[in-house]
Amino acid sequence: MATCACTGQAIGTAAALCNEKDVLPAQLRKNHIRELQQRLLRDDQSIRKVTNKDPDDLARIASVSASDHLEGAEPLHIIDGKVRDVPTQWDHRWGAKAIDGGQWIELAWDGPVLLDEVQITFDSGFHRQLTLSASDGASRNIIRGPQPEMVKDYQISYVDDSGARQGLVDIEGNYLRLRRHRFAAIQVRSLRLHALTTHATEQIRVFEIRCYSRKE
């Protein structure tokens, strides 16, 4: 369940926010609890009945399209505010068959937006146990190393204000669930994640894409 990890993350984030706002924990709970929750969600924490409502996340106001999708694994799921799914269900993920050349999903805005950060949450097989154990019985079915669902190679490109497509990110050998890419601010009309390969599965799986213009 990783309850110690989840609790530690929540306490540490709350302490940092108290320091940032120069308030006591009781004041944080009374006046800033929603901000704390949203910050935890942004860092891939999961809170029951709380979804992404981050006003700074520009992906939330974008339209979403994709090269293809599996039944029930709609492209719009990547901005529904949730990054967990019940096993075998696709209520909060975009999914598409892994093919030669990969699959893409794209965010588009009505007009150009200024971006300098893109955050992606991939599927890392949270439904499957991954524990440290000296027991052969417990370890027998545990998959070590990069999880099979994980997108391995991917690219990010965008259409700029002139209508030209530009390359932005090219990643090989990814094994991380949460990826943040930061770059010099750019004007963007649309942003495309092109998932090329996975580590083992036959489906491309993405939970969420967020887009930000960082505040100095």
PLM segments and residue spans:
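Glycine-rich phosphate/pyrophosphate-binding beta-alpha loops
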Residues: 1-3
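Internal hydrophobic alpha-helix adjacent to the cofactor/substrate pocket in enzyme cavities
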Residues: 6-23
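Short clusters of small/polar residues that mark proteolytic maturation junctions
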Residues: 15, 169-170
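Non-catalytic terminal regions with compositionally biased, polar/charged low complexity
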Residues: 19-54
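Extracellular/surface-associated beta-sandwich interaction domains
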Residues: 33, 50, 56-62, 87-88, ...
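Predominantly extracellular/luminal regions of secreted and cell-surface proteins
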Residues: 54-84
